[in-house]
Amino acid sequence: MNATVSSAVQSSLPFSGKTAQVDEGTVKPLPRSQKTYLSGSRPDIRVPMREISQSDTPASMGAEKNPPIYVYDTSGPYTDPAIKIDIRAGLAPLREKWIDERGDTEILSGPASIYGRQRLNDPRLAELRFDLKRSPRRARAGANVTQMHYARGGIVTPEMEFIAIRENQRCEHLADQQREMLARQHPGQDFGAFLPRHITPEFVRDEVARGRAIIPANINHPESEPMIIGRNFLVKINANIGNSALSSSIQEEVEKMTWAIRWGGDTVMDLSTGKNIHETREWIIRNSPVPIGTVPIYQALEKVNGKAEDLTWEIFRDTLIEQAEQGVDYFTIHAGVRLAYVPMTAKRLTGIVSRGGSIMAKWCLAHHKESFLYTQFEEICEIMKAYDVSFSLGDGLRPGSIYDANDEAQFAELKTLGELTQIAWKHDVQVMIEGPGHVPMHLIKENMDMQLKYCAEAPFYTLGPLTTDIAPGYDHITSAIGAAMIGWYGTAMLCYVTPKEHLGLPDKDDVKDGIITYKIAAHAADLAKGHPGAQLRDNALSKARFEFRWEDQFNLGLDPDKARQFHDETLPQEGAKLAHFCSMCGPHFCSMKITQDVRDFAASKGVSDQEALEKGMEEKASEFVARGTEIYSKV
């Protein structure tokens, strides 16, 4: 049975932890790709990359070798045939030894969260529960276990070294002659970013210490492969998944996560609002090699049966501890929604569109006081630094239409987020700032400028922004336009939008569409910034295209499967993959074939391409004169 059918059948059955299986479609390597590992200063620092092999270029004096291309790989062990994936056991705890060596954590006897203990002791959940063999960790009394705390203390952690190797993408492997051509790129406009040609572990440490970058790495998520979010690094993308009261199962959400990381999701947010949120999240975290984020207020709201006014600090606090003990790497917390800002949204066309923002606005109005997220922020910081959970300070008042873009409410909240950032940094807690939303192109840069001004260069993390509101069903495109622009201006991570945005819960196919669309936006931003090495893959693919190496064209692309499918729809024969044309122009009108013909002619005459063109024109002119200079010939 193929993977798609197997997955569909499994999703229709009641979920059982005893029979859960990985989606077979996520565990095979991409075409002509293999997992390769680069070693660090210690044996257990093994940094994964995807090596894409290329075929040789035919040449008159023999084949010209084309080097393998190395690309950033978010798929974890799933695409490594040497590793057997069993989602019932979860992934290996990659960072566990590093965490243990630091000696600043303690292993608890069980969950400290009241709700966590209730779920663990409920016999009705036995079939759903992930069978975790270890207890949660927490910082020892008086200790701070954040990567920012280590960085500010001058410590370069194994996580930081891992990231430095990963960000460099092994660009130095090219031979001098290859480097001259493949590594050539246009100078970028970086808008004040600092992009070193080679990233060192010390540079990573310094950026984290300054608050310009974060390493989301909860001590209870040792399965994660270290990554970094900051404007002086590669632009990252996030994929949202999660069930709802109407749709989806634990199996489907785990499959969405593994599908998202296969195609390039750097982080995943579980935004579940349906049944068994706790158990769903546990399965996702235990099987995720990328950081996992959540919006804790969603689950807290479920605990009070959906009544925002019944929320309390005690319920929210326990939810934070519950999720931190599971291993959530970053929390979206809408602490910037203040009572005084709610009336500012009254004149909006679309009001408050953030779920978290609307929940807290309703609570503020019901109690006519500041939210507990704002008043208890210092205590939230104490929880965050005990587990190294990063803040993703939520933009609860983001604009939900271009009509409302860049208004008073949006920027009032942003200013408050900057103030909260300073409080978090006082505790050495890592912070990134969430941004809009719906913003027309000419207003996008102001968002980046204001964020840098108010938030002291803390990483910006934006949803798009969507640049127009006229395309339901295509909002992955309307938002990718804005995402590419704001990524260029300095946004560190882009939250993907799928074609289902505003319309329904995305399935696996929608997740892939959103990921690929946002990989394009992030890469376009890296190119525009002039990120060192960003253009290498473009150059390699362009060379393959010009040389009619069809398989290399497919495999160097973001989605080899779709590229091959589109080519084969019109030219399915295997021989067509050796042809010097495609179905777009046919054999006689292919511009690249014509150019190659000119070069072949030049080589045969021993002249340059320009001389060949001139010589060819002279020959045709002589032929025209010899035939009697008649414009039209009788046939």
Swiss-Prot record:
It comes from the Bacteria. Belongs to the ThiC family. [4Fe-4S] cluster binds at C582, C585, C590. Residues 1-41 are annotated as: Disordered. InterPro entries: ThiC, ThiC-associated_dom, ThiC/Bza_core_dom, ThiC/BzaA/B. GO terms for biological process: thiamine biosynthetic process; thiamine diphosphate biosynthetic process. Substrate binds at N240, M269, Y298, H334, S354, R355, G356, D395, G396, L397, R398, E434, Y461. This is Phosphomethylpyrimidine synthase.
